Regions:
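Hydrophobic/aromatic-rich alpha-helical bundle segments in the mid-to-C-terminal region
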Residues: 120-189
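Alpha-helical DNA-contacting segments of helix-turn-helix folds
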Residues: 62-69
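Short, intrinsically disordered or compositionally biased N-terminal tails of bacterial proteins
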Residues: 1-6
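Solvent-exposed, amphipathic alpha-helical segments
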Residues: 22, 26-29, 76-79, 109-113
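Amphipathic alpha-helical segments within well-ordered protein domains
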Residues: 74, 78, 94-95, 111-114, ...
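Amphipathic alpha-helical segments used for helix-helix packing
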Residues: 98-120, 130
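Helix-turn-helix
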Residues: 15-18, 22, 26-60
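Hydrophobic alpha-helical connector segments
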Residues: 64, 75-104
Length: 189
């Protein structure tokens, strides 16, 4: 007797989540303009027309990816600041952010999101998200505006350090070694 297999169908929401994860990786490598929706669909094992049933446009897909990315950063900061005194929150959030940057897709997607800001709709979403993040860090840390500004400045520098993979040349280049000492970059108050 032949054995039958039961194939479970993914819901549209499960499929959307799967596609977003694939698209984050694709956009991280090739950017908004350089990423093909055909390549995303192929990796997801679906047709391009089905992709466009789930996401009406490439921009809508990119923004869905950005929303997931944005929530990961917010959750990283919320978790890091939970249960610690406000004066320690920036240090904890900074360390958690450094760990988050170990994820190549997240690190590169963030840079690609900034690069995609030539599109006014994307720019508006990224700008609003950044403002929300600044407010969250200010609230969680209770830090003065100039300290929060320094925290975000250091975060942007960490993005560049990670994107350039300065750790790979730190043994040969003293300047790179110094810049790869991120704990010293996190504001203490």
């Amino acid at each position: 007797m032949a054995e039958t297999t039961t194939r479970t169908r993914k819901s549209a929401e499960e499929r959307r989540e799967e596609i977003v994860e694939i698209a984050i990786r694709q956009f991280a490598v090739s950017g908004y303009n350089g990423t093909s929706t055909e390549a995303i669909a192929r990796e997801a094992g679906i047709s391009q027309p089905y992709l466009f049933r789930l996401f009406k446009t490439k921009r809508e897909l990119f923004l869905a990816c950005f929303d997931v990315f944005h929530e990961r950063i917010h959750e990283t900061f919320r978790s890091a600041a939970a249960g610690v005194p406000k004066e320690e929150a920036l240090r904890h959030m900074g360390r958690a952010y450094i760990e988050l940057l170990d994820d190549t897709s997240i690190r590169l997607f963030q840079l690609q999101a900034y690069a995609a800001c030539s599109d006014p709709v994307i720019q508006s979403r990224v700008r609003d998200s950044y403002g929300t993040l600044v407010k969250q860090v200010t609230r969680l840390s209770g830090a003065a505006p100039e300290v929060v500004w320094q925290f975000f400045s250091h975060g942007m520098l960490l993005n560049v350090i990670a994107a350039l993979d300065l750790a790979a040349i730190a043994d040969e280049e003293p300047w790179a070694k110094r810049w790869c000492e991120p704990v010293s970059l996190i504001p203490m108050s």
